[in-house]
């Protein structure tokens, strides 16, 4: 720790050199998870960010802004080819499962529901994700209730926009620059 906050350090296993600080912020670092090829370490920074440390050059990159409650532990898991990071975070008092693509540098909310989901884990072949959820009730304010394990296939469904979205776009009013809404006064 440094001034009460956790930080990332390296030290030789034989103790022949002093510790060297890699990364420090004015908040705690928790839930570290190393990738399978040992090139990246993902972690939760404070209460609102998922970060990734590149082991080769010790650079740190912010992957996502998300909400994490201080008293809870959150699971972060790399896919077996290390191209994805799955993690759980809080959204509207309920757990949500997110996936970050290292190739696309894009974040996806995989569940996006009013139910509580969490503990994402990839199958060894990379075709499925397992998670736990209570699809019939919320966890807030009375607790999680009975959770079950679910398997989601990781395929590119819905690669085309829905017809209703295309239809709605036809009738969207164009927004003029500098104007965010109509004011008839």
Label every PLM stretch briefly.
Residues 1-9, 16, 23-29, 39-57, ...:
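A flexible loop/linker signature enriched in serine peptidases of the S9 family
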């Amino acid at each position: 720790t440094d001034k009460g906050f956790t930080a990332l350090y390296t030290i030789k296993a034989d103790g022949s050199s002093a510790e060297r600080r890699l990364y420090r912020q004015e908040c705690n670092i928790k839930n570290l998870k190393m990738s399978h090829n040992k090139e990246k370490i993902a972690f939760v920074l404070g209460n609102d960010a998922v970060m990734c440390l590149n082991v080769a050059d010790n650079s740190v990159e912010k992957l996502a802004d998300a909400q994490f409650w201080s008293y809870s532990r959150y699971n972060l898991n790399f896919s077996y080819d290390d191209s994805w990071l799955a993690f759980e975070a809080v959204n509207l008092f309920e757990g949500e499962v997110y996936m970050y693509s290292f190739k696309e540098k894009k974040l996806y909310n995989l569940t996006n529901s009013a139910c509580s989901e969490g503990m994402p884990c990839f199958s060894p072949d990379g075709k499925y994700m397992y998670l736990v959820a209570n699809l019939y009730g919320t966890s807030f304010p009375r607790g999680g209730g009975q959770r079950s394990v679910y398997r989601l296939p990781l395929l590119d469904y819905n690669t085309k926009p829905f017809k209703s979205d295309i239809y709605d776009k036809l009738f969207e009013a164009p927004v003029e620059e500098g104007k965010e809404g109509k004011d008839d006064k």
